């Protein structure tokens, strides 16, 4: 994992975090708390980030994006240009299949919103970002 994002990625950003757990079991909810703490630590290591929101879907499967209320609200807020970067720990938290991931990131790109999948090392505005999603 890269702690501090360099080069053009280092410019000031309005950042949101997206986290999801698929069940409401105690261990999953604890994992969600760990995800949020991890995001906070990451933000502290990137001083040009201003965290404006966190979107969390609890106890919801990732198979259908339209059934994830926080995810859909995040997309609506992207349309309103409330932020310019979504940070999520890994691709599997964002989408369960390649088609959904590509469709969502392409839509977000139209609004000027990038997605950074930290553990996967994928930044969607990179030249190879879309290819690496597949």
Give residue spans per PLM region.
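Short, structured surface patches at the beginning of a domain
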Residues: 1-134
């Amino acid at each position: 994992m890269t702690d501090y994002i360099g080069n053009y990625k280092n410019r000031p950003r309005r950042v949101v975090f997206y986290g999801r757990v698929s069940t409401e079991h105690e261990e999953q909810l604890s994992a969600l708390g760990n995800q949020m703490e991890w995001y906070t630590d990451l933000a502290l290591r990137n001083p040009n980030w201003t965290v404006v929101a966190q979107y969390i879907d609890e106890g919801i499967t990732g198979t259908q994006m339209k059934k994830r209320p926080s995810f859909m609200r995040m997309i609506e807020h992207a349309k309103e240009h409330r932020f310019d970067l979504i940070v999520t720990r890994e691709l599997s938290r964002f989408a369960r299949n390649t088609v959904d991931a590509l469709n969502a990131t392409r839509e977000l790109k139209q609004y000027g919103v990038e997605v950074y999948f930290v553990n996967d090392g994928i930044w969607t505005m990179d030249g190879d970002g879309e290819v690496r999603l597949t």
